[in-house]
């Protein structure tokens, strides 16, 4: 089966369910790996479900970006193994964007593993009822991002100062120390738009957190 729009073509193999994508000119963009959709029965807390794995075939020199914020110092996520689960200093976003002009949003809320190697790229989710993802095709990177915003919702821009210079450390011991750092920045005429208090500024009793006093 072949489905066409003004931007892309999608082909579905009815014998094995494999899906491939191409742009309007017929240039291949992405294809599911042969036998790349796998369902493994699992049970959590008495609930029966499936661990779902979906594999794709990428070009050898194709760069992909995204997947959140991870502490491995990489922007291009080729040949990486990532746990897509929220953690301290780790932000998981199961979305990637390719230099070939497409984005892929893996639609699953359970802990997920992303892997890429010379053979295939794959998402594996611990619990799912199906292999669910969105393929976004655009002429430019901005257009692909617009399609993602159409899916997730439009977000207002932050205040201008939030895009400025920030100072942070682990951690300031007192309000006096924090304000002293700001004062020093001003004395040196070094730009500073925000400073991060970080943890423990709320004291030992969270129920009585003081919003106007550094109470640790």
Segments the model singles out, each with a brief description of its role:
Residues 2-160, 169-171, 175-176, 182-187:
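Catalytic and substrate-binding clefts that recognize carbohydrates or anionic sugar/phosphate headgroups
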């Amino acid at each position: 089966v072949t489905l066409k729009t003004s931007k892309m073509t999608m082909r579905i193999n009815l014998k094995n369910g494999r899906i491939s994508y191409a742009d309007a000119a017929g240039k291949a963009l992405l294809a599911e790996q042969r036998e790349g959709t796998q369902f493994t029965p699992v049970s959590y807390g008495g609930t029966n479900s499936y661990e779902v794995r979906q594999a794709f075939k990428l070009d050898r020199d194709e760069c992909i970006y995204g997947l959140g914020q991870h502490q491995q110092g990489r922007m291009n996520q080729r040949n990486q193994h990532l746990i897509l689960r929220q953690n301290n200093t780790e932000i998981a976003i199961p979305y990637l964007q390719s230099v070939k002009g497409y984005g892929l949003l893996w639609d699953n809320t359970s802990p997920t593993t992303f892997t890429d190697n010379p053979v295939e790229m794959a998402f594996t989710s611990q619990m799912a009822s199906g292999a669910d993802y969105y393929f976004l095709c655009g002429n430019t990177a901005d257009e692909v991002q617009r399609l993602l915003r159409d899916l997730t919702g439009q977000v207002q821009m932050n205040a201008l100062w939030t895009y400025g210079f920030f100072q942070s450390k682990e951690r300031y011991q007192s309000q006096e120390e924090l304000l002293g750092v700001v004062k020093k920045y001003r004395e040196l005429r070094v730009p500073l738009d925000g400073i991060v208090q970080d943890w423990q500024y709320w004291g030992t009793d969270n129920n009585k957190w003081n919003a106007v006093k550094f109470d640790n």
